[in-house]
From Swiss-Prot:
UniProt EC number: 3.6.4.13
Compositional bias annotation for Polar residues: 28-40
Recorded catalytic activity of this chain's protein: ATP + H2O = ADP + phosphate + H(+)
Record: residues binding ATP: 124-131
Motif (Q motif): 78-106
Name of the encoding gene: dbp5
Name of the protein this chain belongs to: ATP-dependent RNA helicase dbp5
Amino acid sequence: MSSEQPTEAPAGGSLADRISKPEESKPADSTQQPTDNGQTDGAPAQLGGSELHEPEYNVEVKLSDLQADPNNPLFSVKNFEDLGLDPRILQGLSAMNFRKPSKIQERALPLLLSNPPKNLVGQSQSGTGKTAAFVLNILSRLDLSTEQMQKTPQALILAPTRELARQIVGVIQVMGQFLDNLIIGTAVPADTNNRPARMEASVVVGTPGTVMDMIKKRIMVPAKLQVLVLDEADNMLDQQGLGDQCIRVKALLPRTIQVVLFSATFPTHVHQYASKFAPQANELTLQHEELTVEGIKQLYLDCSDEEDKYRTLVSLYGLLTVGSSIIFVKTRQSAMEIEKRMVAEGHTVASLTGGIEGSQRDAVIDQFRAGAAKVLITTNVLARGIDVSTVSMVINYDIPELHLPPNQPRQADFQTYLHRIGRTGRFGRVGVSISFVSNRDEWNMLNQIQKYFNTSIQRIDTKDWDEVEDIIKKTIKNPRSQATFGK
């Protein structure tokens, strides 16, 4: 499909040519994709999310009981009926179009549902059914027999952002829709001081700081909690402040609580932390070499400076609205400025950053899910876990980088890049990611990303916007089986 390949710029025409020799700067061809996409299979199709599309991979299990055989049939299940679930939960699974367990669920569910409860540290990419796995475990352990227990917190799910928390609530609502008297509470930063005097819910989903505050103020009573789940656990434990907040929350909970950590990525130091956070846990992982982001065409555009970045973005606007698109920028200020300029020029865009109040953030993400807003400008608040089925393009307006002291060379943030581009190409569909490069530092960071993931990010020549449009439209509209990636 040569017509889809970006055209190489004449010698001296691209940023790469200006910085280094073409033969040295051109990345080696590779069909291997970055490891893992960091997404959460959170939003059911009824809420604008994606249907489960299971990739090929193998699941490895390491049991805390070293004498036990992880390949024992007791530690695997081929259908939901074999788990002895409440028929009403089976109805909920059917409503989610879950006909049989995914590979992750085959191994995770027997471990999660075992009695006495055991801790679990699970690493799995998105689209594997991990959200449904921990929600199913929670619903199976609830006691809803009395009004008092219906209003008593029995399970707590912690998420790094308000948006992911709301998405998880949506999964619980769909899977638990046939359970009478199921009450779900949210503990996220409030816009005003309108918190309830008491948290009366059997399942609570929230962010660490708000949950800790509600427990300390006795708004939420943790005495009857049976299950603690950390979703996007690597983000929670690795992000400055959130890791400490998680520790403080856990210290306020019953010692017998079942701790479950699920995430798409577990860097070594975070895995060590997680092992302490969930001691004597069963471990479940995907074979690392098979964790890939498939179906994402990775491209980059040369820009002469910051202003040229903006002009390029405006030129891309028509393509951004083919489906839905997310534009990732470095700072809240950049997001606001770009939104203001584009709206003034008559373009329909929305922005979502951590600085926006809660209810407004909810409204923006709901509009984006519904398709009322097709272009969303955001910081890394959306880089993880949000599943919106219509996203076909991601723009790295600013290449993600680690926060390092000013005197150190700029370093690309590989995990954030992975999570960002994972917003597109969701569950079997084709997507496009485009990175803007405007200076030597950004070019170096792009090269770091290519080398780290052993992949090729192709350059598009912006001299012919008709050709750019043709390349991207053909890629988006192609079924994944017909698309070419990393070539």
